[in-house]
Every structure is written in C-alpha cells, then in structure tokens.
C-alpha cells in the first residue's frame, strides 16, 4: 500500500525495528532504550513532573527514569518549539529488545487497558493488537479517555495501560533471569508472568508459550491527561541513550 511515496507501516513492524535496535544492557546500565515522548506547555512543567513522580513512585511506570527537553533543544531530528517542553519515559518495548538480545524470541502481541481491583490485576478490558493498527494501541486507548490511573492511585482500583507479549515456554528460565536483571536495573513495570499454555489476564496465549504483561510507559502521561492538563504523546517515539535519562527524584 503506497500513495505519493508514503508507505503505511503497521505498529508490529515498527516494534520489531525498535527491538532490534535496542542495545540497553541492564547489568551495565548502558545502551539505547526506546523513548515515549510527550509535549506539554512550559508553564505546566512543574505540575507534570509532580504527577510523574507520584505515578512512578507508585510503580505504575516502566522505570523511574525520565528525559526533559527544554524549548529550543533538539532530540534527534526534532526541535522543541517555543513555549513547549518535551518529557519522555522509557517505553516497555525496551524490555522486549533486551529479551531479544538475550536470544529469546519474544513476540509483542497487544496493548490494552487492564482492570485493577484492590491492587490486583484482574483482566484486560480493552485491547488492540499490534498487527492491526498503524498507531500505537496505548496512544489510541489513552486518547479515548478510558483509563482511570489516577483513581487507581487513590483507591487501589482502576484501569491502567499495559501490554502483552508471548515467548516460548522452553525459555522460561532465561526469561526469569533477564527480568531479574531488569528489576535490579530499576525496571519495576512487570505486571504478570503467566504459566505456559494459560490465559493471562483473560487473554489467550499461543500453544507452548507464556504471556508477560508489562505496565505501559505512558501511564504517567495518562494521569496528566486525566488531570486536564494538555499533553501530546507519541509512544515509541525514538531511541535514546540511557545515559541521557534522569531519575525523577533528581528533577522534582
């Protein structure tokens, strides 16, 4: 499908490309990670950073690391316009890139909204598969206003953004070892690792595979939106060196 030189790229293809280009090593805390990038009004920066800190400290993000790009500064081929500030989080697909580099043929399957009840993940209530859309599912679902991440923070029950990937069950030991390394590196967003040949949060898993659910890196952005602060988010925006990221507590 091509028109006027433009070729449609489904999200699954973009994910595979970013996974192969991810070089982050959790043991060395170095390499390139995938960044979710949002634009906000400069006047809202302090409020947004406060919200990000609240969400991240509650464990509803992939890592405690963020990137702030001031007006006039550039990130890749993008320059932040006057009156705006860029703010980025680590995308959960970075985890898939790390697993892939470890020789585990992981397959990101879908993004969706997970219902949480009293702090326990119950089920996916809305999902979009990566092969069926040209826009990141979490970006779409966030724009629909169907999350209630802020309510989850207040009451322990609500709807948060998350995504699901499958991996061969024979690689379970290697998966757990690599997830442990990521946990040591501050990647706290692993929501659930399912049993082989078992549905995960009510989603069926391919035979001889297991499912892994990870919190979406755009949950902090979803809370900003829920608070009525204008924010324009581009999930899986680009690759960036992990060394350019800062811990949220160093910024607030």
UniProtKB/Swiss-Prot annotation:
InterPro entries: NRD (IPR002846), NrpR (IPR038982), NrpR_dom_sf (IPR036984). Residues 8-247 are annotated as: NRD. It holds the Pfam family NRD1_2. Keywords: Transcription, Transcription regulation. The keyword Magnesium does not apply. Transmembrane segments: none annotated. Signal peptide: none annotated. Under nitrogen limitation, binding of 2-oxoglutarate to the NrpRI/NrpRII complex decreases the binding affinity of NrpRI to DNA as well as the binding affinity of NrpRII to TBP and TFB, which leads to removal of the complex from the operator, RNA polymerase recruitment and initiation of transcription. Belongs to the NrpR family. Forms a complex with NrpRI and the general archaeal transcription factors TBP and TFB. Interacts directly with NrpRI, TBP and TFB. Involved in nitrogen regulation. Under nitrogen sufficiency, represses the transcription of the nifH and the glnk1 promoters, via formation of a complex with the global nitrogen regulator NrpRI. Does not bind DNA directly. This is Global nitrogen regulator NrpRII. It comes from Methanosarcina mazei (strain ATCC BAA-159 / DSM 3647 / Goe1 / Go1 / JCM 11833 / OCM 88). The gene is nrpRII.
